[in-house]
Amino acid sequence: MDLQAIVTDTWNALADERGGGTPARYIPALAAVDPCKFGIALATDDGQVACAGDADEKFSIQSISKVFALALALEREGSALWDAVGREPSGDAFNSIVQLEKEKGIPRNPFINSGAIVTTDRFIGRRGVDEAVRDLIDRLRRMGRNPQIDFDQDVARSESEAGERNRALAWFLADFGRLLNPVEEVLSVYFRQC
């Protein structure tokens, strides 16, 4: 199987779709991203890498980071994590406050914003924000086999400045006793991560 040919053919097949999406407008740094940028990179477990398009461009992984936060939280908490966050589809918006209130502060799953805030809190644990941030970056660099992976400080700042809804979710979680750490500490990691 010619992995590079598959990736290139896929990239070419999607040529007409480039620019069809809309970057998040509520986060100013993301609103400025060129929607025509499109790259594919595929890495196999035996070390093969195939790339096409804008694959060498740095980009913000946004909610993809929630998978890595969940992995770190599960390593620290084990199955006890599922007492703090569910494993069910939400059926509501990714940033719903109403559902969080109805569910008494237990997010439906770790991939909606309230659930990701809880998993971020749990991978921070009691060790502190700086160590948690280093742990997450180290994990992303190892798994991506790329020592250049880092947080985009402009996007993090922009997320924080436009983060009223996520602050509301975090304060709801804190009010229900679901966070171990102060809200602003959890959000300082969450905004860098996501």
Which residues are covered by each model-predicted region?
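Active-site SXXK
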Residues: D46-G47, S60-W82
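Long, repeat-rich segments with strong aromatic
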Residues: Q193-C194
